[in-house]
Design a protein with these regions (language model features):
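Low-complexity, Pro/Thr/Ser/Gly/Ala-rich linker/spacer regions in secreted
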Residues: 67-74, 169
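Solvent-exposed, low-complexity, repeat-rich "mucin-like" stalks and linkers
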Residues: 1-23, 71-122
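Serine/threonine-rich, repeat-prone extracellular segments and beta-strand-based repeat modules
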Residues: 19-66, 104-168
Length: 169
């Protein structure tokens, strides 16, 4: 999850549904151990919501605060989803969630072969020298995991984005 350092509300864009109460987005609470400042960086937070029966669910995640003035010209990664739920032992391939990467004045989009092809040069494929994926997901164990996608430009600028993966029974 990424928010501008100028963001007023770190729950904006977050929603919650419950089988008993329906939409409980207005009951989402944010907690954190270390104070969140207006300094760009990564912060560990927990989003939680409760239904009227008192059942509480929590989602611990990393939130990135960024300075919009520093975003110009940096590589960008777009995922098809940013939060997914998997069942125990369900197959998972992190590359399946990559939609688009913009790096070095080139846009790469997912092709029919699931590779990222340059829009302006179909024969050019985004390689591992520019894109790395850190995948700690163990679908054999319940938990909340974060897959980190990082792209690096020829000038050495990097950008990362996270996919939150919840593995449940």
């Amino acid at each position: 999850l990424r928010f501008s350092v100028n963001a007023d509300d770190l729950t904006e864009g977050i929603s919650a549904e419950d089988c008993l109460d329906g939409t409980i987005t207005d009951r989402i609470r944010l907690s954190y151990q270390d104070e969140i400042s207006s300094t760009p960086g990564l912060y560990q937070v927990t989003y939680s919501a409760a239904n009227r029966a008192g059942d509480v669910t929590s989602l611990p995640v990393t939130v990135e605060l960024y300075d919009p003035a520093e975003e110009s010209g940096k590589p960008q990664i777009t995922l098809s989803e940013y939060l997914i739920h998997l069942e125990l032992q369900q197959a998972f391939e992190p590359k399946d969630y990559l939609e688009q990467v913009n790096v070095d004045q080139m846009t790469y989009e997912k092709g029919e072969d699931d590779e990222l092809h340059a829009v302006s040069a179909e024969d050019k494929i985004l390689g591992e020298e520019k894109l790395s994926i850190e995948n700690p997901v163990d679908t054999g164990k319940e938990g909340v995991y974060e897959v980190t996608y990082t792209v690096t430009s020829e000038e050495g600028q990097t950008s990362s984005i996270r996919l939150i993966v919840c593995v449940n029974e």
